[in-house]
């Protein structure tokens, strides 16, 4: 028994070292911009850079729009499949998995061919149109995470009973979804939203090919032209991502644990 515990701790130490040592090395390097000693100058340079503020703010705005549009699509669809058409669930799950199967570069080239200046809907002709195209591309990219989060939330409540009770009280379908179903799955919705937001903020391929100056593109440009600031940006991105994961874990503590009644 003691030998098993010893080996377990050895494996844990090796695994932890595999992840922690590169992170610690990156942190150390980001603090060595001055040879005289450790300093936060690299982080100060990043936060003071107007391009950081612009690209991060733009990525955050696009991310929030992505979450809103994604919820407007996913929540009603998942609710309908759960309540009225459970036979469609395998098809919906397959469709939502396609963004994980199809490479992002293939996806964005398809968008460019469909919505270029010679198409019926030339979104790439204007900044607003390209930003809209980027948002919908991110909605597709976030579908696997958003749909599964919402579907998991719907599994924890009795959708049939709640819908029947709300209908008896005179609620229409929009009121049922917005005032009854949505508040009961808010924790799952927020989990999917934080995960989608974390993915969108760091995305590079789609935004780069659409010529959008987002945070991921800014990180690549800084990495190509500076030494210590890229390390600082990596740590900032790491903190943002794990902050989102921490929020998901925290919100998960408040999720309902009871299974729906049959």
Model-derived regions: residue spans:
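Short hydrophobic, aromatic-rich alpha-helical segments embedded in or entering the lipid bilayer
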Residues: 35-48, 210-222
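Left-handed beta-helix
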Residues: 153-163
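Glycine/proline-centered hinge or cleavage motifs at structural transition points of membrane proteins
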Residues: 169-170, 183
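Membrane-water interface segments at the C-terminal ends of transmembrane alpha-helices
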Residues: 3-35, 48-155, 180, 184-204, ...
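The alpha-helix within a helix-turn-helix
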Residues: 166
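Short cytosolic juxtamembrane segments of multi-pass membrane proteins
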Residues: 252-262
